[in-house]
Every structure is written in structure tokens, then in C-alpha cells.
């Protein structure tokens, strides 16, 4: 699968709005009610990744799971990354996960 051009990436990103492009990757933080819920999500995500034979970088921090996708052998993003991102997005919906919100700026006085 060929590496996507900048224009192709820009076109693909709206289909995965919770994912953020960072360099040659796309990343999403999923937030769950607790650690066991986060781990259950990771287990389901791992099964999807194994089936697709495309494995994300996974970081678990208590109730937050960060998934990062790139296609290493192509040196950047491919349609494979966006297809798997869409599959991951379908997992937490039924379990109530939400995208992480950026930290606020605090209260203005």
C-alpha cells in the first residue's frame, strides 16, 4: 500500500475527526471510566490490529488509551492507517469512551 500524499491525508482526516496528525502518524486518545475499561478496549483493539496485521503503538495511562498509527515500511501514513483508525473508532462507541479533551486554559479573572 503506497504512502499517502499530503493532499490525500488532508482528504482522509475528516473521516476520523478525533484523530490528530503528528508528523508521519495519526494519534487518538480514548478516555474511559476506569483502568479495567481501558484494558478491555485495548484487548479489542489488539484483536482488530492482529486481524488487519497492522499494529498501533499503544500507551495506557489509567483510564486513557493513546493509539498511534503509521505504516513503518512505507515511512508514513497509508490508507491502512485510516482504515484501522475507523475500526478503532467503532469500538468504544458502545462502551461510552470519549475523545480526550485538550486541557483548558483555566479561568480568566
Stretches with model-predicted labels:
Residues 1-16, 21-109:
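Charge-rich, low-complexity N-terminal segments
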